[in-house]
């Protein structure tokens, strides 16, 4: 028998046979690791095929013939790289399919970021009692402890973990907004201004340094003293409001630009840290300190700009014909880079001033935030303060809303247009319900002539009632006005006790007359009829306006 037939028989037997016995003679349970290939039995349920090897075999085929030479594994040598792969991947960026570049040993069973159902674990597929067909019911496992002993070391435990699902576009946008929402605040505006200041400062430094050779030529020609023969010009300049010029001040401008650049980058890096957001913004002194730093840099840049502009005309010497000779013309000529440097200096000065103003705004904003958090903490500690605050805010909002209502405008009253408020709704605010009169729904817009005649009949029928009630109510109100005038003349404090009691009784009776239910009912009915008739009249006038009818004969 050849060796290939033996290997094929062993391979076929491994797929068609299952463990025959799982217990030792002493009654103990053995795991899969302790089972031997010789202890196999026939079963209706074959074992699942083993997983494919992670590394393919070497050679032309796995089962080669005996005549072929045995495959020899290549001599693998460790690869030593001067630059680590992590650094290369960082500078190389992302690839479309990075899995294809990984070695075979790095390929995992579960992909990252793909939403899929994890495969079922073949080790713990069945939790019901297992029966051995060769032994009947004696091979039943009823204990979970025995099952755990059978699967002591589960090689597929990693498959039970939950896979990481891919994020949707909305989740990415939400994460982006949460990450960069800080840049929308006043502190974020300061960081943006800091980046602008760094760019402008670098421009100032580059433009000023590009023409520093002119200073070298000045010192080579005139030295470190005033130009020869210009002493009189110096005194002449003092006479006409000038000042003494001893040489270029470019080093001062470079020192100011460098100092401001270093200070700005320190503040910018500090502002992007969590220490700035959690500790410094909660303090009272840091926004004012940042304001002082920006003001100081603004003053330094203003001084540097003035000094650099003064250097371009050599302290005013270029305006004198005695100095502005062909030999000295190169010192008075202003190059394009120098003009750019002056522009950068003044723009940077303005940006630092804007940063100082933003620091003041940030200081006020953070103070208001701390005060609001303090009030919320007090409300949590003392619930009575929260109820009082809500009642106060509701009363203020009601008072403001009552002041805006115009009682004299009957058209607004009849239309009953709901009030539209825009802005922040205070906590605890309870809106007032809108009471819609019945005649608004009962008498809609007139569509036909019959509706107009019906509205006209209702108007004429109830107009007489309104006239009677109105005359009666107006008469009572006139009497009340006269009594008010008489009551105002009565003394409020009398020395006689009986007279004081009599005046008090008169006041009490007068108050009862004013609050008489029958009078209040008549007054309410009169107001209702007035609004109803106004509504009906408005409907008739609207219809007549559309139909171009003359309604002057109607009341």
From Swiss-Prot:
It is a multi-pass membrane protein. Disruption phenotype: No visible phenotype at birth. Mutant mice have normal gait and equilibrium and are fertile. They display severe and rapidly progressing hearing loss already 14 days after birth, and completely lack response to a 90 dB sound 21 days after birth. Endocochlear potential and paracellular permeability in the stria vascularis are not affected. The arrangement of inner and outer hair cells in the organ of Corti appears normal at 12 days after birth, but outer hair cells and inner hair cells have disappeared by 21 days after birth. InterPro entries: ELL/occludin (IPR031176), Marvel (IPR008253), Occludin_ELL (IPR010844). Residues 1-71, 118-142 are annotated as: Disordered. Residues 46-59 have a biased composition (Pro residues). Residues 185-364 form the MARVEL domain. GO terms for biological process: bicellular tight junction assembly; cell-cell junction organization; establishment of endothelial barrier; sensory perception of sound. Interacts with TJP1. Interacts with the ubiquitin ligase ITCH. Interacts (via C-terminal cytoplasmic domain) with LSR (via the cytoplasmic domain), ILDR1 and ILDR2; the interaction is required to recruit MARVELD2 to tricellular contacts. This is MARVEL domain-containing protein 2. It comes from Mus musculus. The lineage of its organism: Eukaryota, Metazoa, Chordata, Craniata, Vertebrata. The gene is Marveld2.
């Amino acid at each position: 028998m050849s060796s290939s037939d033996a290997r094929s028989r062993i391979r076929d037997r491994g797929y068609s046979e299952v463990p025959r016995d799982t217990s030792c003679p002493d009654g103990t349970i053995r795991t899969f690791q302790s089972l031997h290939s010789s202890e196999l039995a026939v079963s209706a349920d074959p074992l699942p095929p083993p997983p494919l090897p992670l590394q393919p075999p070497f050679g032309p085929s796995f089962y080669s013939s005996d005549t072929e030479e045995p495959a020899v594994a290549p001599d693998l040598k460790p690869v030593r790289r001067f630059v680590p792969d992590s650094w290369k991947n960082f500078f190389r960026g992302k690839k479309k399919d990075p899995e294809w570049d990984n070695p075979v040993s790095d390929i995992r069973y579960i992909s990252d970021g793909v939403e899929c159902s994890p495969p079922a674990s073949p080790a713990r597929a069945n939790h019901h009692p297992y029966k051995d067909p060769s032994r009947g019911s004696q091979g039943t496992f009823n204990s979970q402890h025995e099952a755990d002993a059978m699967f002591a070391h589960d090689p597929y435990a990693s498959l039970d973990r939950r896979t990481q699902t891919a994020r949707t576009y909305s989740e990415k946008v939400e994460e982006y907004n949460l990450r960069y929402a800080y840049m929308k605040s006043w502190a974020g505006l300061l960081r943006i201004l800091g980046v602008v200041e760094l760019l402008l400062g670098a421009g100032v430094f580059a433009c000023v340094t590009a023409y520093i050779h002119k200073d070298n030529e000045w010192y080579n020609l005139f030295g470190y003293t005033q130009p020869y023969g210009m002493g009189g010009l110096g005194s002449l300049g003092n006479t006409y409001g000038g000042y003494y010029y001893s040489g270029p001040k470019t080093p001062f401008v470079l020192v100011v630009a460098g100092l401001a650049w270093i200070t700005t980058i320190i503040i910018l890096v500090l502002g992007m840290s969590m220490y700035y957001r959690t500790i410094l913004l909660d303090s009272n002194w840091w926004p004012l300190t940042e304001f002082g730093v920006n003001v100081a840099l603004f003053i330094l840049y203003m001084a540097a700009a003035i000094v650099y502009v003064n250097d371009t005309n050599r302290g005013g010497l270029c305006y004198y014909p005695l100095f502005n000779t062909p030999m000295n013309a190169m010192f008075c000529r202003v190059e394009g880079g120098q003009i750019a440097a002056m522009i950068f200096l003044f723009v940077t000065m303005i940006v630092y001033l804007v940063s100082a103003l933003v620091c003041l705004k940030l200081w006020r904003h953070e103070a208001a935030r701390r005060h609001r958090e303090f009030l919320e903490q007090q409300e949590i500690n003392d619930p009575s303060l929260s109820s009082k605050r809500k009642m106060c805010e509701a009363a203020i909002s009601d008072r403001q809303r009552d002041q805006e209502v115009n009682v004299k405008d009957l058209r607004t009253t009849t239309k009953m247009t709901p009030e539209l408020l825009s802005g922040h709704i205070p906590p605890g605010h309870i809106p007032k319900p809108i009471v819609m009169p019945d005649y608004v729904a009962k008498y809609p817009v007139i569509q036909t002539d019959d509706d107009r005649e019906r509205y006209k009949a209702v108007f004429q029928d109830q107009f007489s009632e309104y006239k009677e009630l109105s005359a009666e109510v107006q008469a009572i109100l006139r009497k009340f006005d006269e009594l008010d005038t008489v009551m105002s003349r009565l003394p409020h404090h009398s020395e006689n006790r009986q007279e004081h009691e009599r005046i008090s009784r008169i006041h009490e009776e007068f108050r009862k007359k004013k609050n008489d239910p029958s009078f209040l009912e008549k007054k309410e009915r009169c107001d209702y009829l007035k609004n109803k008739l106004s509504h009906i009249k408005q409907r008739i006038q609207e219809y007549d306006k559309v139909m171009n009818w003359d309604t002057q004969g109607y009341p």
